[in-house]
A protein has these predicted regions:
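Active-site phosphate-binding strand-loop segment of PLP-dependent enzymes
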Residues: 556, 560-611
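Active-site PLP attachment segment
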Residues: 623, 629-664
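PLP-dependent enzyme catalytic core of the Aspartate aminotransferase-like
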Residues: 468, 472, 476, 503, ...
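Conserved PLP-binding catalytic core of the aspartate aminotransferase-like
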Residues: 702-708, 716-750, 764-765, 772-774
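Short loop-beta-helix segment that forms the pyridoxal 5′-phosphate
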Residues: 484-488, 498-522
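Active-site/acyl-donor-binding loops of N-acyltransferases
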Residues: 2-9, 75-77, 157, 166-196, ...
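Acyl-donor binding region in acyl/amide transferases
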Residues: 53-55, 60-61, 67, 73-174, ...
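A conserved beta-strand-loop-helix scaffold within acyl/acetyltransferase catalytic domains
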Residues: 6-89, 139, 149-307
Length: 779
């Protein structure tokens, strides 16, 4: 009840049309759209398609004068079917792991089998009065039947702003829906309509009507067709199964029989036969208004002349002819097969807008609206229509925003990558571990799980000698240094670690930083400046790209490990101050850089080399000195960077090189100068880990054997997994949602791995890199 008006609005909701008198449902004066007519709703309810829960909304004045009518239904909707990047095979796989993935119950206002304005009104001026009442009733119904989302669908552009003004304060957000195709009929015959087209466009339409002469196909025009209902359902299912366009209804023989029964004199079926056998149909409907509606179609794709006959085009032309003969002013052609429909004279694509709201969570509301905008495919359009659509897309995106354009946090409101994973129930980041990381680890709520995703390659994070060294340093020095290394933050422990690292790598000097990421930022931003050129492998770690941007230098890429491409880049940049920046081992792929060729090219072209050995130190080379040492070119690397958070079981990083270079970084590397020093416990743990790793070389052999064992076993099972002689085994899956779902499924099954997607993984690949501390029997 709307009590804010002198004449209250009374709202009633019925669960079946059988409880409603047809005369009380239909609005007077031709205001009821065809699709919302009583008899047009009957086939959907009577056939039981899609297991819908039906609700029929009636808003009247207290004296019984009708104000508005709306068709509501509650339906389970698989949002994953709208994701164009998720193939049916991947979707099936995820559903097997997580049966409820992206499946929600929607309470929708609109029509299931056609596109039409969702709300019929006595007068357009009643919208502001009726729509809030409708939204309130939907809210209550959603609460009662457990619907996750509310959706008011298929709003016309001309009504959009008024709907927005009413629904946005109620928590709804807009999204572009599936676009429909209409043509305005202004001709007295099909021949006149074809005369509006060029010869090139007219000829295919005209010849499509020659199916009898060219292929021996006959067509029946039927007003009663219940006896053909099983055939119609079978032919329709062929279209649903094969169509690339999204279809959500699931029609059965009862639906077609009910259409014949309830829509006699207001529907027509064209049944195409070849040698007496039904091969295709087109079913159209019309009401008292000016619209002629193409409702459903089906075809046998195994029919021998299927492609050449183009019966869909022929049926469109027969429909246009019938619409003209009935003096209809508009032919509504639905939401699929845009390319063919746009060949019809006067055809235009019309955007439709959905208004969405989660029943309880505003974040889910925003996420769904963004996902719908992103996932629903837009048709390829002529330039004039395309420009209009682009304007609508931008307008809807702006109206989706919960924050104004000038607010810097608007980008936060616009993202839906991680909130989408949460909505789908496959978000697994930030798992909580409750114990030390060995070959297994205790996870909160999961218990003991196998650990196949860790940077502790040598398993030294729990080694007694390393743990005791860390504890002793804390007892001796305290928990932190409370200052920059440049000032009060340098301990004798730091100095001795720098000396040991320099000696370990055969370099004159080394300098510490608080993290590996900081080490790259500090070194590269100090060494490079505007006018310099940084040349990077396309698959370098994110920190190296961030460091290049921070430096202000120009930078360019060469294809991953493509030395011919690198040589061309060096020739093209001859005469500039240059440095090649490269990962020794690529953390997402497990591949090893061709450092020998890089060193040779750098010497030939007078270029410096900066190598990040983070994932190689401790694992590759003599005594674990890294890939450069393994390839015999460590002395030719101008700057060597490494981190302590991998093999050395701690945290922090360092840069090693000639003393003048290192001293320059000490005084100019912001990440070193303006950060607190490495905690004493971390420095001492690194000291101890270095000692243990050199004393126990079998640890390196074991981790590489485990990686090879893992890669071989996965490849044998058909996975794209390769062993590159490092501790990292990537499994490439090709889709981010699958990678995240697989990761969560494995974790809940007792195995931890790392899911990786851009920007962590470049090139659009998605996968699970296994970083192995485990022995083969555990694997």
């Amino acid at each position: 009840v709307d009590t804010d008006n002198d004449r209250p609005t009374l709202a009633r909701v019925y669960r079946s049309l059988r409880d409603i008198c047809p005369d009380s449902w239909n609005l007077p004066g031709g205001r009821m759209p065809t699709g919302l007519g009583y008899d047009f709703l009957r086939p959907v309810e009577d056939s039981g398609i899609n297991d819908l829960k039906h609700y029929y909304f009636m808003a009247d004045l207290a004296d019984g004068q009708p104000l508005g009518r709306a068709n509501l239904y509650s339906v389970c909707f698989d949002l994953a079917t709208t994701d164009r990047k998720l193939t049916p095979a991947w979707r099936t796989t995820i559903k097997r792991w997580f049966p409820g993935f992206m499946t929600f119950r929607f309470l929708e206002c609109g029509l299931l089998t056609m596109v039409s304005n969702p709300l019929a009104l006595r007068s357009d001026t009643d919208l502001e009065r009726v729509l809030p009442v409708l939204a309130g009733q939907m809210d209550q119904l959603a609460h009662d039947d457990g619907s996750d989302f509310l959706m008011i669908r298929d709003v016309d552009p001309e009504h959009y702003q008024r709907y927005l003004d009413i629904l946005r304060p109620l928590g709804f957000r807009p999204a572009l829906g599936f676009s429909r195709v209409d043509t305005t009929i202004s001709w007295s015959s099909v021949e006149e309509a074809l005369g509006c087209l060029s010869h090139k466009r007219r000829l295919p339409l005209k010849t499509s009507l020659e199916f009898r002469e060219r292929f021996g196909i006959e067509v029946e025009e039927l007003d009663e067709y219940a006896e053909h209902a099983p055939v119609l359902a079978r032919l329709w299912r062929n279209v649903k199964t094969e169509a690339k366009d999204y279809q959500r209804e699931d029609l059965n023989p009862e639906f077609f029989a009910a259409c014949s029964r309830h829509l006699h004199g207001r529907s027509r079926l064209w049944l195409f036969r070849y040698q007496g056998t039904p091969i295709a149909f087109f079913l159209n409907v019309w009401g008292a208004d000016e619209n002629y509606i193409l409702l459903e179609w089906g075809i046998d794709r195994d029919f021998e002349h299927y492609r050449k006959a183009n019966l869909y085009r022929a049926a469109l032309m027969l429909s246009l002819k019938d619409a003209i003969s009935r003096d209809k002013r508009r032919m509504e052609m639905g939401i699929t097969n845009y390319f063919t429909k746009l060949r019809i004279p006067g055809a235009r694509v019309i955007p439709t807008i959905y208004f969405l709201r989660h029943s309880t969570d505003p974040v889910h509301t925003a996420t769904l609206a963004r996902m719908m905008m992103h996932n629903i495919q837009r048709p390829t359009l002529p330039d004039d229509m395309s420009e209009e659509f682009c304007r609508w897309e931008e307008r809807i995106r702006l109206d989706q925003d919960g924050l104004p354009e000038h607010d810097i946090f608007r980008k936060i409101d616009r993202q839906h990558k991680y909130t989408g994973l949460k909505l789908g129930g496959v978000y697994g980041f930030y798992p909580r571990f409750t114990g030390p990381q060995r070959s297994t680890v205790k996870a909160a709520e999961l218990g003991e799980i196998v650990l196949l995703g860790t940077n502790s390659y040598l398993g030294l994070a729990t080694h007694p000698e390393v743990v005791e060294a860390s504890a002793e340093a804390t007892r001796r020095y305290g928990t932190g240094c409370s200052g920059s290394p440049l000032l009060n933050g340098t301990l004798d422990l730091h100095v001795s670690l720098e000396q040991e690292l320099a000696c370990f790598l055969g370099k004159p000097a080394a300098v510490l930083c608080s993290t590996g990421y900081q080490s790259n930022l500090a070194a590269i931003s100090a060494l490079c400046e505007s006018g310099d050129m940084i040349i990077q492998d396309a698959l370098n770690h994110r920190s190296l790209f961030d460091a290049a941007r921070l430096s202000g230098a120009d930078f360019t890429l060469y294809r991953h490990n493509d030395m011919d491409h690198l040589a061309r880049v060096l020739r093209r940049t001859e005469g500039r101050r240059r440095i090649i920046v490269v990962d020794a081992v690529f953390s997402m792929e497990g591949t090893v850089a061709d450092l020998a060729t890089i060193a040779e090219l750098a010497d030939r072209h007078g270029c410096r080399v900066y190598v990040d050995e983070s994932h190689a130190l401790g694992v590759l080379g003599p005594d674990g000195r890294g890939a450069s040492a393994a390839l015999g070119v460590l002395a030719r690397m101008d700057v060597v960077m490494g981190t302590f958070s991998k093999s050395f079981a701690s945290v922090g990083g360092f840069i090693a090189g000639d003393r003048p270079v290192v001293d320059y970084i000490r005084h100019n590397g912001s990440g070193h100068v303006f950060s607190a020093s490495l905690p004493p416990a971390a420095a001492a743990a690194t000291h101890a880990a270095l000692r243990v790793s050199r004393r126990e070389p079998d640890r390196r052999a074991r981790v590489l054997a485990a990686a090879e064992y893992m890669a071989t076993g996965l490849a044998r099972q058909g996975y794209q997994a390769e062993y590159h002689g490092t501790a990292i085994v990537p499994v490439i899956l090709g889709n981010p949602t699958v990678a995240h779902a697989g990761y969560l499924r494995l974790m809940r099954s007792g195995v931890y791995v790392n899911p990786v997607a851009p920007p962590s993984r470049a090139g659009g690949a998605f996968g699970i890199p296994h970083q192995l501390p485990s022995r083969p029997p555990t694997i």
